[in-house]
Every structure is written in structure tokens, then in C-alpha cells.
Amino acid sequence: MRFAPDYVLCPPTATRRLRATHPSVSTIYFLFTIFVVSTVFHCHQRLALVPAPWAYSARVVVVPGHLPREGMWTINAMGRLGNQMGEYATLYALAKENGRPAYIPAQMHSTLAPIFRISLPVLHSSTASRVPWQNYHLNDWMEERYRHIPVPYVRLTGYPCSWTFYHHLRHEILREFTLHDHVREEAQAFLRGLRVNGSRPSTFVGVHVRRGDYVRVMPQVWKGVVADRGYLEQALDWFRAPTAPPVFVVTSNGMAWCRENIDASRGDVVFAGNGLEGSPAKDFALLTQCNHTVMTIGTFGFWAAYLTGGDTVYLANYTAPDSPFHLVFKPEAAFLPEWVGITANMGRALWSGL
């Protein structure tokens, strides 16, 4: 028995006609490009995308067809790094306390994710616009009523900056604010290269000096002061020991002032920070890889001390008794009980024009 062949020969004229109607390679490439661009565009409309290159470091929220029954909690992303760390930790703790899932704004993710291994999912603006949020204002410290917020879709507001919100979850907060390996390793490599009078130090004290806008805001708005030369002398002397002298690693958003006002004649002070407020990762990592902390004022220094552990010295009583700052700030809720406060010299600091 004979079988028909698997192919049919075409006459030359038919072959030429087929070639004439077959699309060219450039046409196929163009159509494929249009298909890919269209697919990406439609996916972008449906998914809550996060700006590169850190999109992989957190779960991304898809716009829901129906709002989840368990609710959704988020928080306003206000301020720079220290403020947003406080907001993140507060959202993490209060949402857990109230049994609600927590989501962070994309803006907060862009600030924190390049530095830390945060885990909360990201709430894109396209999702946020579909949620019937109820704003819930927080004071700067924890209150009992925050443990029972009977609202499913909450947007927390304010500038919470107190350990009283989350200290009972300290280990979880430290895990959330674990540095990325490359950030930590760069800081550790810098510290390993430091020498005190020719010897490698065994103890590092991170020093953060807040200057910048606070130089104007504290006296003009809050009837207060920033750290002066006298405070920093006392704070560094508190850590100096004759047997195992530490090295002081100074960071600040006013490095020129620090070089003029911090005595480095003993050879144990290193002016290490770059002072760039827009890219704080290097300075923050250096502080957290030290053993102890000298802070002045502000949330950046607080978080450096909180993550570092060890001993912390801070500037205390830096506002006048009638300062409006006392309406929004409680020192006992801002500084851990075991930290050591050195009282600011209000008179000398105000006269010096700081």
C-alpha cells in the first residue's frame, strides 16, 4: 500500500506569491513590541507597582475587587527617615494590637526599603484611593485608647515618635529595621579601618549632632536649644576611659560646625558623616554599627540609639518651662529609662545664638 507524501511541491510561481504575502521580519518585530508594551501597560493599571529597584523587597498589594473584611490599616508618610521609622513601627504595633492587617504607603517604602529589610506590604496610591479611610490622629506617645480602635479602615496620622508604642515588640522592630547586607558591610568596613593613636579600637561610640533647620526652629518656635559645645564635651567625657579608650564616630547635618566645636586633639574623634539629608543610609548605618551612642535631639538620633543598644547619652531639658513643645512631647516617653540625660545649658546656648 502506498501512502501520500507528507508534503506537497508547489510550482515556482506559487512560492513567489507566498513570499510576497508573508510579513517581513521587521513587521513581526514591530507587532511583537506593540504587544509587549500593551501588556505591560495593562498590568501596570491592575497591579500596585512599587518604584524600582526595591519592588522585590515587599509584597505588593493588588487593587481589591472587594475590600477585605478584616479591614486595612495604614499611616501617613510624613517627614524624613527618623519620622518615617517611627510611623512604620507605630503602625506595625498598633495594627497588631488591634488585629488588623497593616499596609505602608509607597512613599514610605521608597524611604525605608533601600536601607532596611522591612516586611509590611505596600499600599499603592491606586489602591488607597478606593478605601473608605477614617483618619485617626495619634499623640506622640501611647495611650490606652489606642489598644481598642473599633474602625476597620484606618489611616493613622500625626508624628508618633515614642518607644511606648512598640517597645514590647522590640525584637520584631529590630528585625524590621535590619540593614541590608551591603549597607551594613560598608559601614563595618569603614569602622574596621579606624585607629586611635595607632591602635585599632575595640569600642565605637556613634555621635549624632542634629543641626540644620533645628538651629532656627528650636529657639524661634519651641523656646529651646540644640546641643552646644559644652554638652558634647560632657557627653564624650562620659564614655572616655583610661584603660580602653573608644573612638567617637561623628555624623551630623552640620559637619562644618562639628569640626569647629568638637575637640579632636586627643585623636579619638573621627568626622565620618557626609551630612546628606537626602541620602541618610551611610550616616545611619555607621551609627548603628557602633557599640554606644551620643545623641542630641531628633528622631534620627533616637532611632540610631534604639537600634544600636548599648549605652546612650542624650540632651535633656532643652526647652524652656513655658515652651509649647511640652504640649506635644513627653521626655519620659521619648527616651528609654536606662538612657543617661545631660541637661542643656539653656542660658549659655541662647546667648551664643545657636
UniProtKB/Swiss-Prot annotation:
TM stretches of this protein: 23-43
Cytoplasmic topological domain residue ranges: 1-22
Lumenal side: 44-354
Residues with attached carbohydrate: 197, 291, 317
CDD domains referenced in this protein's UniProt entry, alphabetically: Fut1_Fut2_like (cd11301)
Pathway as given in its UniProt record: Protein modification; protein glycosylation
Principal location class: Golgi
GO MF, one example: alpha-(1,2)-fucosyltransferase activity
Keywords: Glycoprotein, Glycosyltransferase, Golgi apparatus, Lipid metabolism, Membrane, Signal-anchor, Transferase, Transmembrane, Transmembrane helix
Tissue expr: Salivary and lactating mammary glands.
Localization, UniProt: Golgi apparatus, Golgi stack membrane
GO biological process per UniProt: carbohydrate metabolic process; fucosylation; glycolipid metabolic process; protein glycosylation; regulation of cell adhesion; regulation of endothelial cell proliferation
Catalyzed reactions per annotation: a beta-D-galactosyl-(1->3)-N-acetyl-beta-D-glucosaminyl derivative + GDP-beta-L-fucose = an alpha-L-Fuc-(1->2)-beta-D-Gal-(1->3)-beta-D-GlcNAc derivative + GDP + H(+); a beta-D-galactosyl-(1->4)-N-acetyl-beta-D-glucosaminyl derivative + GDP-beta-L-fucose = an alpha-L-Fuc-(1->2)-beta-D-Gal-(1->4)-beta-D-GlcNAc derivative + GDP + H(+); a neolactoside nLc4Cer + GDP-beta-L-fucose = a neolactoside IV(2)-alpha-Fuc-nLc4Cer + GDP + H(+); a neolactoside nLc4Cer(d18:1(4E)) + GDP-beta-L-fucose = a neolactoside IV(2)-alpha-Fuc-nLc4Cer(d18:1(4E)) + GDP + H(+)
Topological relation to the membrane, as annotated: Single-pass type II membrane protein
EC class (word): transferase
InterPro entries xrefs: Glyco_trans_11 (IPR002516)
One Gene Ontology cellular component annotation held by this UniProt entry: Golgi cisterna membrane
EC number: 2.4.1.69, 2.4.1.344
Family: Belongs to the glycosyltransferase 11 family.
PANTHER family from the UniProt entry: GALACTOSIDE 2-ALPHA-L-FUCOSYLTRANSFERASE SEC1, GALACTOSIDE 2-L-FUCOSYLTRANSFERASE
Function: Catalyzes the transfer of L-fucose, from a guanosine diphosphate-beta-L-fucose, to the terminal galactose on both O- and N-linked glycans chains of cell surface glycoproteins and glycolipids and the resulting epitope regulates several processes such as cell-cell interaction including host-microbe interaction, cell surface expression and cell proliferation. Preferentially fucosylates gangliosides GA1 and GM1 in the antrum, cecum and colon and in the female reproductive organs.
Extra remark: There are three genes (Fut1, Fut2 and Fut3) which encode galactoside 2-L-fucosyltransferase in rabbit. They are expressed in a tissue-specific manner.
The name this protein goes by in its record: Galactoside alpha-(1,2)-fucosyltransferase 2
Naturally occurring in which organism (per UniProt): Oryctolagus cuniculus (Rabbit)
